[in-house]
């Protein structure tokens, strides 16, 4: 995986609190176990008026032409609550979302997002309010998220955020659990070479 240092992107504002993983990716789309192909089902029951996903809902914000190609999702508190399905961050990432900004995230969803190289940024409610006002008032509004400096930059302002050092290291260096393990491949091979043959 490539690392994440800084990203500037178009922002889509999803002004709803307590969005759960069933809304992010409904249960009928969970049959696959790889990460590809879930983006077309993201927020399916909100994005579409029909079960087949052929009739876009013109009232849903992500269907608005001004937000086409958005890579940053702005949301309200407790984003990603509900069941712990990893398909939710898979769907967001496959759709093209690289960063999510909200006052809070469900704990398991937060960890799953980082494992899938997306950056969940926690800001205060007041700061999120300011970003909603900026994005909704300015078509094509972009935000910069600088993970190295742990800053969000928008509308001439800077907002600081925190992320624990280990998770930040993983994101900056594009490391998931497998990547972390492979960093110690030499030591693993050395250990395995010492195992008696009758134990292999």
From Swiss-Prot:
GO terms for biological process: L-leucine biosynthetic process. CDD domains: IPMI_Swivel. Its EC number is 4.2.1.33. Keywords: Amino-acid biosynthesis, Branched-chain amino acid biosynthesis, Leucine biosynthesis, Lyase. One of its GO terms (cellular component) is 3-isopropylmalate dehydratase complex. Pathway: Amino-acid biosynthesis; L-leucine biosynthesis; L-leucine from 3-methyl-2-oxobutanoate: step 2/4. It is an enzyme of class 4 (lyase). Belongs to the LeuD family. LeuD type 1 subfamily. Catalyzes the isomerization between 2-isopropylmalate and 3-isopropylmalate, via the formation of 2-isopropylmaleate. This is 3-isopropylmalate dehydratase small subunit. It comes from Vibrio atlanticus (strain LGP32) (Vibrio splendidus (strain Mel32)).
